[in-house]
Amino acid sequence: MVTGTFRRLLRGSSITSSVSAVGSTAAGAPAESELSLEAGESADEPLNVCLLSYRSNPYSGGQGVYVKYLSRALTELGHSVDVISGKPYPDLDNDVGLIRLPGENVVDELDRLGQFELSYLRDPLALYEWLSALTGGFPDPYAFGRRVVDYFEDHQPDYDVVHDNQSLCHGLHTLRERGHPVVATVHHPITVDQDAALAAADDWKERLLIRRWYRFLEMQRDVVQDLPHVLTVSESARRHTVADFGADPDAIRVVHNGIDTDLFEPRDRPRDRPRVMTTVSADVPLKGARYLLEAFADVRGDVDAELVVVGEFDDGGDCDRLVSELGIGDAIETHSEISYDRMVDLYGTADVAVVPSLYEGFGLPAGEALACGVPVVATTGGGLPEVVGDAGVLVEPEDPAALADAIRELLGDGARRRRLGERGRRRIVEEFDWERAARETVRTYHTAIETQGQGA
């Protein structure tokens, strides 16, 4: 049970260093803007931007997507961008610099005790990572922040602004104290993940392990409360960041993510029977997959439909067992770690896309499906209503009967599916653009730069 719990938490965490740089562009470039805008300077003046991301998986979760597309949009606006990232590293364009700060990544290993190396005795940070992971903790955000501070001390990079992507580490305090303007993005407070995991725990032992894993939240609360410039990707995430982290409401600006509408576009592909599609970025309670499985089993009583799952359920996990109990395994088609182009092809075969999450800070899967012209059934959890709007069907979280009714109704009404598909595509193209997101983000950069020397 212990190992399974650790694996689920790691997959769901929206959670002596060697340094190597690949294609670094910003750190070595001459500064083209000072720490505060001089009179008459343009807000469009190019900036040297440092994006921090402690984990940037390009295939799972939203943080790697955020880093990839925001860095691209910033460079297209004329700014220079370096991404400093721990493993897994992001997929970046060639004109975006990547500075690798690998940690020990002990939490990725099942045999944590066996990962001990004698070199840890000479490296206090590596020893901390190993001990924390060995005792059920998640050391990555804190350790990444320490390595970032060390990197800045060793290399003295010339950045105009540092933008943290949800590490919310103590290292941000240090960077601000040393004169670096800092902005941080909170996709959603991870307290939401902790609460969902605790609610689904089987016994007090598992709850104890969960609380140990999420100890890093104490650090993130402390850091967010002290930051004067915070971005959230939805109004819902803003409210929860204030409520759960105690953030100053006046310090937060909402900047919605964009969607790559050149990549995610309608493609009509042949299908043999009705197809329902969903993505599973992590097999954790927060994603609500069990409610979709129950709903799909209900729908199968009336419609010979197929469920397409992009992602995978943990072997022997709750969802894996539920598939067997419901007898729907022969109607489920799974795909894991596929290319974006392949994902768009799969959307082209789908009649309905479903996002059953209990909570999403934004809801990239909903936006991507809408961009592909696929009608969406989603819950009202978190930022999903802000993405879906009137272009889909919204139901309450944790309600498989409501999900089943909405799916069944759309599968039986082709005209409504077409209307919603067209409306969804139009909504995403018009309202969720990465260039717009980058421009709004740059406004916050300039505010941070202007106020850094004023004790903000």
Where are these regions (language model features)?
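Conserved acidic donor-binding segment of nucleotide-sugar-dependent glycosyltransferases
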Residues: 393-400, 409-414
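Short hydrophobic beta-strand element within catalytic cores of glycosyltransferases
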Residues: 375-378
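Carbohydrate-associated surface elements
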Residues: 236, 258
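Short alpha-helical donor nucleotide-sugar binding micro-motif in glycosyltransferases
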Residues: 337-338, 345-350
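Conserved donor-binding/catalytic core segment of Leloir-type glycosyltransferases
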Residues: 268-296
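Nucleotide-activated donor-binding/catalytic signature segment of Leloir-type glycosyltransferases, i.e.
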Residues: 320-341
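Aromatic "clamp/platform" in nucleotide-sugar-dependent glycosyltransferases that forms part
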Residues: 358
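Acceptor-binding helix/loop patch of EC 2.4 sugar-transfer enzymes
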Residues: 113-136, 176-221
